[in-house]
Amino acid sequence: MTDLTQLEMIIEKAFDDRNSINTTTKGEILESVEHALNLLDKGEVRVVKRQKNGKWHVHQWLKKAVLLSFRLNPMQIMTGGVNGTSWWDKVPSKFSHWQEADFKKADFRSVPGAIVRHSAYIAPNVILMPSFVNLGAFVDEGTMVDTWATVGSCAQIGKHVHLSGGVGIGGVLEPLQANPTIIEDHCFIGARSEVVEGCIIREGSVLGMGVFIGKSTKIIDRTTGEIFIGEVPPYSVVVPGSLPGKPLPNGEIGPNLYCAVIVKRVDQKTREKTSINDLLRD
């Protein structure tokens, strides 16, 4: 197959002409999109890659490949459900046609009820409880995806992360300029928390239960008063909070507004030695 530079050029050109692409399109375009998705599925490429300066670079052409696949793939029966049940979809399971040898080679644990769509990469030593990992996502080694947690399209989950029960990590395919949601290495995301809209949780951070972070969420460091938007600094301990409401026109006190509060910041050694409960205890 073509090298990555040529593959990118083919997909970029096809995306510019996407209105003419449908389920009857074959040849170079179909082969290129399928190849790109297979590379994502194997972890040989990823939608977002961290650079040496700590910033994340988005490979938009890979997002475009995922979007083109929806135009190219027809709706069809997807097998593999419990007791022989099926689905009606355009995206096959990652585990379609897998045999025992494939699971052994991949070296992660997937318990009954875990759903992973093709083009999502799951690294060795990951544990997938009954959960959902969407296409284009990347889950790095040693991470736990707990029961009913969801990892959205193209989301990036780092090494040794714990996504607790019911956690939602938002996906993003459109608009194209939007960046995927990123959870960096060694983070703990508490039960029923949500991180969406391309926000970044930096390395070693702890989110308590029920923390919601989107692009409009104010993240306030109660020690310094500093306000962050869209990003939690490294080794932060974050809990839900609220901001005082502004007065209403009649002079009464207005409703409080939700925010996330950084209650403390810890260094790497403290984070490694201290239990999550102790970190969250104020």
Swiss-Prot record:
Its main location: cytoplasm. Keywords: Acyltransferase, Amino-acid biosynthesis, Cytoplasm, Diaminopimelate biosynthesis, Lysine biosynthesis, Repeat, Transferase. One of its GO terms (molecular function) is 2,3,4,5-tetrahydropyridine-2,6-dicarboxylate N-succinyltransferase activity. It comes from the Bacteria. It catalyses: (S)-2,3,4,5-tetrahydrodipicolinate + succinyl-CoA + H2O = (S)-2-succinylamino-6-oxoheptanedioate + CoA. It is found in: Cytoplasm. Pfam families: Hexapep_2, THDPS_N_2. Substrate binds at residues 109, 146. HAMAP family: DapD (MF_00811). Belongs to the transferase hexapeptide repeat family. This is 2,3,4,5-tetrahydropyridine-2,6-dicarboxylate N-succinyltransferase. It comes from Bartonella henselae (strain ATCC 49882 / DSM 28221 / CCUG 30454 / Houston 1) (Rochalimaea henselae). The lineage of its organism: Bacteria, Pseudomonadati, Pseudomonadota, Alphaproteobacteria, Hyphomicrobiales.
